[in-house]
Amino acid sequence: MTKSELVAQLASRFPQLVLKDADFAVKTMLDAMSDALAKGHRIEIRGFGSFGLNRRPARVGRNPKSGEKVQVPEKFVPHFKPGKELRERVDGRAGEPLKADDPDDDR
């Protein structure tokens, strides 16, 4: 699901919400989450999962073109850990074959 598909689904699920307002709501939520992660905070959404940061230590890498050794600095990367309810919901579909996205499928 893309951001625009999420906005469209949100607007269709709540008829009083105009598409422009749904887009603003999604954008605001994503901006707030990005800002929190950039400040080093953890985000927990009960029943869904948590977002945090994982530290990748500095290391010696290799330039694939020249083969030259390069120092890669330490960095932090976003990490998502699904919650129990989300894992169970996704696992319930484990035996089902993959199919094209169905906009009417609310699972």
Curated annotation (Swiss-Prot):
Keyword Chloroplast: no
Span list, region Disordered: 76-107
One of the record's GO cellular component terms: cytosol
Keywords per UniProt: DNA recombination, DNA-binding, Transcription, Transcription regulation, Translation regulation
Biased composition (Basic and acidic residues): 82-101
Pfam families recorded: Bac_DNA_binding
CDD domains: IHF_B (cd13836)
Single biological process term from Gene Ontology: DNA recombination
Molecular-function GO term, any one: structural constituent of chromatin
Quaternary structure annotation from Swiss-Prot or TrEMBL: Heterodimer of an alpha and a beta chain.
Function: This protein is one of the two subunits of integration host factor, a specific DNA-binding protein that functions in genetic recombination as well as in transcriptional and translational control.
Family classification: Belongs to the bacterial histone-like protein family.
Protein name: Integration host factor subunit beta
Gene transcribed to yield this protein: ihfB
